[in-house]
C-alpha cells in the first residue's frame, strides 16, 4: 500500500509538471480570455541623471521578450500574470556621468509582433551655482570641452567699452553702457541660451577705467564684482564663458608691440592683472575659460623705420606676453591649475598664426589645456568695408547663387565658400589635429540694408554666417558671432527687447550648426 501511494504521488507530480510546461508555452491556453496581439505601456520612460528603476507592462497571448540597445539601460522580465496575460518588464538605468542627454530604445516582442519603448535620461552634469564649491575640479581638457561649446556668441561693445583716456584710472561700472545702451541681465543670457548658443565670449576691459592703484595694477572691486555677476548668469544657464582682456585702451595690444615697448614692465603688469582675475574666478569650474588677450599686435606692430614688424618677431614678442599670462593663472592654483586657457595668434590672423607654428613657442605645465584663438572677417569688402575705395568697392552679395546685376557688388569668386573652407582647414591641420582646439573668437558681416530691402543681400548674409559656422565646426573650431547691440551692422540680438533682431544672421548660425559635424 505504501509503495502504491508513493507511485501515485510521483505520477501526480509529473502531471503537474506537464501542465506547468504547457502554461509557459507560446499559445498560453490557461485561465483568462484570449489576447490578440501585443500591447505595451507606457511607450516612453524618462529618468533623472541619477538613474533608477521603472517598469513596463506587456500584455500578450504569447511569451514576451525584451532587449535594450544601450548598455546603461538594462531590462529584466518578471513573472507573467496568467489570467491577465500581463508580463512586467523591469528597466534599470545607471547614473549618467556624461554631459549629454542620452536615449535608448527597448524592443518588446511577442511572437511575430514587436513594440518599442523610448528611454530618455537627462545629462549628468549638474548646473553649477553662482558660487561654485571651492573643492570642485576641472573635469575636461581642451579637446573635451571644445565640443561642448559651439556655437558661441559675443557680448560685444559692453564690458570692453570705455575711453582710452581713462587708462590706469577708475571710472566705475557705468562703462558697461558706454558703447551700447543695455545693461546685461540674467533674462538676456537665458535668451541667448534659448537660441541654441552654448558659450558666451565676454570681451572685457580692466586697465581702461577700472584700476584703483596704478603701481599695483589693482582692479576696482566693484568692477570685478559686476564681471563676476555676468559670468555667473552664464554659468547658471549652463553656458561656457570665455573671459578675456580685450583691447583695453591699447596698453598692451598696441603699445606692447612698438619698437620701444617696455616689454619687461608690460609682462609684470599683465601678470598682476591676470593674477587678480584668476584669483577672483578660482573656484569656478571648467565652464569658465580665460583668454589672455584679444587681437595682439593689430595697429601697433611697427619698427623704427615705419614698416610692419616681421611676422616671426611679432610672434616671438607675443609669446612672451602669453607665457606671462599662462604662468600667472597657473600660479594661483586650485581650479586654475588645470583650467583651459586660450592664447591668441599674431593679430588673430589665420595665415600669420599658422605660419609661425605659434604654440610651439609656449610652455604650459600641463598638456592638453590650451586653445588657439583667431578672428574671421573675410572677405573685408563684403563684411566690413564702409565705403568704396580707389582699389575696390564694397561687396553686397556673397555665396553660391547670390549674384546681383551690378558686377562691382558681387564678391570675387576666390573669396566665397571654398575660401572659408580652406581657411578653416588650415587651422585644423596646424592645431586641431595636434590636440589644440581653436576658437574663432569673432566673426561677423555687416547687414548693409534693412532686412527685406535687398533679398539677394539678405541671402548673402545668411549664407556667409552659415558657411563660417559650419566650416569652423567641421574643422574643430568654435565660432563666436560678433554682436554689438547697435541696431544695425553686426547686431543679432535686440538686448533691450530680448528678441532676435537680425534673422538672416541668426538663421545662418542655426543652419550652419545643423549642417556641421564636429571632427572628433
Q: Predicted regions: what is each one?
A:
Residues 14-44, 111-135:
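Bacterial Sec-dependent N-terminal signal peptides
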Residues 37-38, 59-90:
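Surface-exposed binding patches on compact interaction domains or structured appendages
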Residues 99-112:
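A short beta-strand micro-motif common to beta-rich folds, especially ectodomain repeats
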Residues 126-199:
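N-terminal carbohydrate-binding accessory modules
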Residues 156-184, 212-219, 261-262, 381-419:
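Acidic/histidine-rich helix-loop elements
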Residues 179-200, 210, 215-247, 251-292, ...:
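An active-site-proximal structural segment forming one wall of the substrate-binding cleft
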Residues 264, 268-414, 425-445, 474-475:
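Active-site region of glycoside hydrolase catalytic domains
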Residues 411-498:
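Substrate-binding cleft of secreted/luminal carbohydrate-active enzymes
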Amino acid at each position: 500500500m505504501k509503495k502504491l501511494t508513493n507511485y501515485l504521488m510521483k505520477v501526480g507530480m509529473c502531471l503537474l509538471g506537464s501542465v506547468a510546461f504547457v502554461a509557459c508555452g507560446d499559445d498560453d491556453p490557461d485561465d483568462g480570455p484570449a489576447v490578440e496581439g501585443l500591447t505595451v505601456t507606457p511607450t516612453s520612460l524618462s529618468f533623472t541623471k541619477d538613474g533608477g528603476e521603472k517598469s513596463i507592462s506587456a500584455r500578450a497571448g504569447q511569451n514576451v521578450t525584451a532587449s535594450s540597445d544601450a548598455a546603461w539601460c538594462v531590462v529584466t522580465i518578471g513573472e507573467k500574470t496568467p489570467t491577465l496575460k500581463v508580463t512586467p518588464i523591469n528597466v534599470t538605468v545607471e547614473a549618467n556621468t556624461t554631459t549629454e542627454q542620452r536615449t535608448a530604445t527597448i524592443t518588446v516582442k511577442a511572437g511575430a509582433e514587436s513594440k518599442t519603448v523610448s528611454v530618455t535620461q537627462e545629462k549628468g552634469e549638474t548646473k553649477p551655482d553662482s558660487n561654485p564649491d571651492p573643492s570642485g575640479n576641472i573635469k575636461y581638457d581642451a579637446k573635451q570641452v571644445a565640443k561642448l561649446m559651439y556655437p558661441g556668441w559675443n557680448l560685444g561693445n559692453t564690458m570692453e567699452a570705455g575711453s582710452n583716456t581713462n587708462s590706469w584710472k577708475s571710472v566705475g561700472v557705468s562703462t558697461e553702457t558706454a558703447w551700447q545702451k543695455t545693461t546685461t541681465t540674467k533674462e538676456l543670457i537665458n535668451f541667448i541660451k534659448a537660441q541654441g548658443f552654448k558659450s558666451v565670449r565676454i570681451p572685457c576691459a580692466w586697465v581702461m577705467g577700472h584700476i584703483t592703484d596704478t603701481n599695483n595694477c589693482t582692479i576696482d572691486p566693484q568692477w570685478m564684482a559686476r564681471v563676476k555677476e555676468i559670468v555667473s548668469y552664464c554659468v547658471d544657464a549652463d553656458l561656457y564663458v570665455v573671459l578675456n582682456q580685450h583691447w583695453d585702451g591699447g596698453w598692451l595690444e598696441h603699445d606692447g608691440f612698438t619698437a620701444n615697448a617696455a616689454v619687461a614692465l608690460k609682462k609684470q603688469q599683465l601678470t598682476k592683472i591676470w593674477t587678480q582675475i584668476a584669483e577672483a574666478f578660482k573656484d569656478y569650474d571648467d565652464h569658465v575659460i580665460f583668454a589672455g588677450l584679444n587681437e595682439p599686435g593689430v595697429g601697433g606692430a611697427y619698427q623704427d623705420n615705419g614698416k610692419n614688424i616681421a611676422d616671426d618677431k611679432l610672434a616671438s614678442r607675443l609669446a612672451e606676453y602669453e607665457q606671462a599670462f599662462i604662468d600667472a593663472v597657473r600660479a594661483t592654483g586650485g581650479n586654475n591649475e588645470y583650467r583651459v586657457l586660450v592664447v591668441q595668434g599674431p593679430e588673430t590672423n589665420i595665415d600669420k598664426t599658422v605660419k609661425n607654428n605659434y604654440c610651439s613657442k609656449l610652455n604650459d605645465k600641463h598638456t592638453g589645456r590650451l586653445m588657439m584663438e583667431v578672428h574671421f572677417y573675410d572677405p573685408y569688402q563684403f563684411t566690413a568695408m564702409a565705403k568704396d575705395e580707389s582699389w575696390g568697392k564694397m561687396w553686397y552679395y556673397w555665396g553660391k547663387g547670390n549674384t546681383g546685376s551690378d558686377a562691382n557688388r558681387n564678391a570675387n569668386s576666390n573669396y566665397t565658400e571654398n575660401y572659408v573652407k580652406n581657411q578653416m582647414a588650415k587651422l585644423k591641420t596646424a592645431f586641431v589635429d595636434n590636440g589644440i582646439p581653436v576658437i574663432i573668437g569673432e566673426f561677423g558681416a555687416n547687414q548693409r540694408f534693412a532686412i527685406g530691402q535687398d533679398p539677394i543681400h539678405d541671402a548673402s548674409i545668411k549664407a556667409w554666417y552659415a558657411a563660417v559656422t559650419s566650416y569652423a565646426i567641421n574643422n574643430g573650431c568654435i565660432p563666436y558671432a560678433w554682436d554689438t547691440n547697435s541696431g544695425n551692422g553686426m547686431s543679432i540680438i535686440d538686448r533691450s527687447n530680448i528678441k532676435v533682431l537680425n534673422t538672416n544672421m541668426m538663421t545662418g548660425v542655426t543652419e550652419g550648426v545643423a549642417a556641421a559635424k564636429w571632427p572628433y
